Design a protein with these regions (language model features):
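Short, surface-exposed glycine/acidic/tryptophan-bearing loops
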Residues: 4-57, 75
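Disulfide-stabilized extracellular recognition modules
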Residues: 44, 52-104
Length: 104
């Protein structure tokens, strides 16, 4: 199910990548996905993050992630219960961030 805190963490990272011109799981401040979800108030036992850039439609990004073993594993992990999504539009296409997790 959608979780607002995970969505906030995902959006923060999508905006950070766009505003600071990079594409990486590590934020411009050195943060990782676990730090970002905790800063958003999420008490995580499990957290994983998928990022993508340039895919114009959601169907394309989901297909891309499902065809990538690591991204697919994040999305289908049996203990994952919640997700959040952040999308921001850049001049060369959108930045996509999916954060999945389970609270303790």
């Amino acid at each position: 199910q959608f979780n607002r805190q995970l969505g906030r963490a995902a959006m923060v990272h999508a905006c950070d990548m766009l505003e600071n011109g990079f594409f990486d799981h590590r934020g411009s401040d050195g943060s990782n996905s676990q730090a970002r979800v905790q800063n958003a108030g999420y008490r995580d036992c499990i957290v994983a993050e998928n990022i993508a850039w340039g895919y114009p439609r959601s169907e394309q990004i989901v297909n891309g992630w499902m065809n990538s073993p690591g991204h697919r594993r994040n999305m289908l992990h049996p203990r994952i219960e919640e997700f959040g999504v952040g999308i921001t539009q850049g001049p060369k296409g959108p930045y996509w961030v999916l954060v999945v997790g389970k609270q303790c």
